Regions:
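Extra-cytoplasmic beta-strand recognition segments
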Residues: 61-68, 121, 136-169, 194-201, ...
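Extracellular carbohydrate recognition and processing domains
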Residues: 176-206, 560-562, 704-714
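Catalytic-core region of carbohydrate-active enzymes that cleave or remodel glycosidic bonds
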Residues: 308-309, 400-413, 428-431, 435-545
Length: 715
């Protein structure tokens, strides 16, 4: 039996007081395309303190006393392993730590616990220190530390003393002068660095507590790697903050991309992400400067932890490899063997067994089961329109990675970069084979709302699409319902093109509200709580209710009523142009407006000074026999509206146009009834890649029709 569902919706349009009726007919018996079972996933990047002080559950900031960048974020020093942290005027400054109860603390730079650590802390308690008046240090955490009644906290630290000494120590969390969690214990410390572990429970709640480590008698102790963890997601050691990880799990992700983003590349070779320095015991990880987003990373949440989190979320891991490019420079493309080997070793670490070097290291690090890594992205935003940007020889780099990875791991799916900005239709401009292409879109709500059909024209025989980064980033504040609805329309379009779009991920996910480097973000948090934007709930709604396939639909709607009276206009966007011969006629041949040469007497010669100018530099050449109109500014939204008001139900607009310079093409304005209500034919927009008709009603924009295309200069 054929089932037909009919839905009728009424929407009010800003241009007129009339309503438009649309009827959507759904035929559930006629199958369309299969929807990708891996469509919705996560894009994770260390940005906005997403990990440090966020998803990575470590509560103590500057736990290894390495960070000395307070107040001088743009200075760097070389510690023998490359750029890491800044050098303040006072090298003894230890950010986020302070002395309490008359104690003295100093940076220790000799006799360290290993070759990775460059500093430790030497604590000397007050000569009057006692159990009633202890003396020591405190840490402010990442804008506070949450204390929770009943939660178990795990403190680990490394210590040594000048001689074998038994210390009485009080530690815990304190807020407003009161202990919210506390434990007093005794430890014998020797001149050899040793690791100590203590647990204690919270006895009261506080949103912004501080951590204290106090000596109950005079003495000197050297400390390093002072670490405090609350209960973690799935009780993983060195794991994730529960509420943030649970919010990720509630999105039902099918994959998790990591570690970025620009975080992959860094601002130099030394500040790029190197996975081999992020595995093993945390005290053996040097950390690195997250130069792109302006803060140091412990790399406590490293490659191993990313793989573990993906497994815990039920998501496939998607690892982004560096192709020898960083922001502002690169390794010559014919000298990238080290980067290729790093990628091969990363796959071996994830998937190898005990007979392999890196598989054995994974097992030694506590994860016997392989991680089934089969998705590798080759580079991040490295294939741009302008080859003089950071995308130096991306195609040649990609080809080397493809050959090496497919030879050893033929099952691995490789994701290539395409243009990440400057166009709505990025393309793979080389002959190398590729499994998926990564497209990025950061646009307005109206752009997304107009893009339901975006993928309709894509080649069904070409590479699959991974829309790896997308979000409304303008006209949305910190994220609102309008943004979420625009994204939802775009997401439905991806589902409707399931034979093309295989994967998609919103970006970015997290922001610590105390250090926003990007806006908007899906999940916001501070030390005590987390909350989500409307976009987060749309992501969850779509992922939890994704179907297996589409069905046939037919949409019929009344046309938007045309205005009774209107004007027309000309425009340009970051382009210099010339126009002549503007002519507006009715279907029966009646002329409503005509741009004529200065010698004509039938119609007055056009003088652009009489037009309504929105922006740009406009001039009309009254001496030219054709009366040419020129726009010579390189600026956005350069529009000139003809002063003549016309009246007709249907009409044709013709004009001759020539592009003389700039990035795009022409704008032909019609149905203009005011600055906030008009339509235009956008020829060669979006970086000279696309033609489109766009409707602007009450300043909101939709795109009823579009097609790929470009124009040449001086034609």
């Amino acid at each position: 039996m054929k089932k037909i569902l009919s839905l009728v919706s009424v929407a009010a349009f800003a241009l007129t007081a009339q309503s438009q009726t649309a009827t959507l007919t759904i035929d559930a018996t006629q199958k369309g395309v299969d929807i990708s079972p891996t469509l919705y996933g996560l894009f994770y990047e260390e940005i906005n303190h997403a990990g440090e002080g966020g998803l990575y559950a470590e509560l103590i900031r500057n736990r290894s006393f390495e960070e000395i960048d307070q107040g001088l974020p743009n200075r760097r020093f070389d510690n023998g392993r490359g750029e890491r942290f800044g050098r303040p005027a006072n090298p003894n400054l230890i950010p986020f730590w302070s002395a309490e109860g008359g104690a003295e603390m100093n940076a220790l730079t000799e006799g360290l616990m290993n070759d990775v650590q460059t500093r430790a802390l030497r604590l000397t308690a007050s000569a009057k220190a006692s159990k009633a008046s202890p003396s020591g240090i405190k840490n402010s955490g990442f804008w506070g530390i949450k204390a929770t009644k009943g939660d178990k906290y795990t403190l680990t630290f490394w210590a040594k003393a000048d001689s074998k000494t038994k210390f009485s120590i009080t530690t815990g969390l304190k807020a407003d002068g009161e202990w919210k969690a506390q434990k007093t214990f005794a430890k014998t410390v020797t001149p050899v660095w040793q690791k100590y572990k203590v647990t204690f429970k919270g006895k009261a709640d506080a949103d912004e507590a501080e951590f204290f480590f106090l000596l109950n008698k005079p003495g000197t102790i050297c400390l390093d790697m002072m670490s405090l963890f609350p209960p973690t997601y799935k009780n993983r050691p060195n794991g994730c903050r529960k509420d943030l990880a649970e919010k990720l799990a509630d999105l039902h992700p099918k994959f998790m991309r990591f570690p970025g983003g620009c975080f992959v590349e860094g601002m130099s070779r030394e500040t790029a992400y190197e996975w081999k320095r992020t595995i093993g015991p945390v005290e053996d990880r040097p950390g690195h400067m997250n130069a792109n987003w302006g803060y140091p990373c412990t790399d406590g949440m490293g490659y191993h932890e990313y793989l573990q989190l993906a497994e815990d979320l039920g998501a496939e891991p998607l690892y982004v490899v560096n192709v020898g490019i960083w922001h502002g420079g690169n390794q010559p493309y014919d000298q990238i063997e080290e980067y290729i080997q790093n990628a091969l070793d990363a796959i071996e670490y994830a998937n190898g067994d005990a007979s392999t070097v890196w598989g054995r290291k994974r097992i030694e690090n506590g994860h016997k089961k392989p991680s089934n890594l089969r998705l590798i992205e080759v580079g991040n935003e490295n294939y741009q329109v302008n080859p003089n940007e950071q995308s130096d020889h991306y195609a040649e780099r990609y080809a080397q990675f493809y050959k090496a990875i497919k030879a050893k791991y033929p099952y691995v799916q490789l994701i290539g970069n395409v243009e990440s900005w400057g166009t709505d239709y990025p393309s793979w401009r080389n002959d190398n084979p590729v499994d998926l292409l990564d497209e990025h879109y950061y646009r307005s709500p109206s752009w997304f709302a107009s893009k339901f059909h975006h993928y309709d024209s894509y080649d069904r025989q070409g590479p699959k699409i991974y829309c790896g980064e997308y979000a409304v980033t303008s006209d949305c504040g910190e994220g609102n319902l309008k943004a979420a609805l625009g994204e939802a329309v775009f997401m439905m379009g991806m589902e409707n093109n399931g034979d093309v779009v295989a994967m998609a991920s919103y970006a970015p996910i997290f922001v610590n509200v105390h250090d926003r480097r990007w806006m908007p973000d899906m999940i916001r948090f501070d030390a005590a709580q987390s909350w989500a934007s409307p976009s987060y709930y749309v992501q969850g709604l779509m992922a939890k209710n994704v179907g297996t396939h589409t069905v046939k639909t037919t949409l019929t709607q009344t046309k938007q009523p045309k205005p009774d009276r209107f004007r027309v206009g000309l425009g340009a966007w970051n382009t210099t142009v010339e126009y002549k011969g503007l002519h507006v006629t009715t279907p029966d041949g009646r002329t409503l407006y005509k741009q004529v040469p200065p010698t004509s007497s039938q119609w007055p010669a056009v003088d652009i000074k009489d037009w309504d100018i929105t922006a740009g530099t406009w001039e009309s050449d009254l001496l030219d026999k054709d009366g040419i109109i020129r726009q010579t500014a390189i600026a956005e939204h350069c529009v000139a509206i003809c002063p003549t008001e016309m009246q007709a139900r249907d009409y044709d607009v013709t004009v001759q146009a020539r592009k003389t310079g700039g990035d795009e093409g022409f704008l032909l304005v019609f149905d203009h009834t005011g600055k906030r209500n008009y339509r235009w034919f956008n020829v060669a927009g979006w970086g000279n890649t696309q033609h489109a008709v766009e409707d602007i009603f009450n300043s909101g924009k939709t795109q009823p029709a579009s097609a790929r295309g470009h124009i040449d200069d001086n034609r």
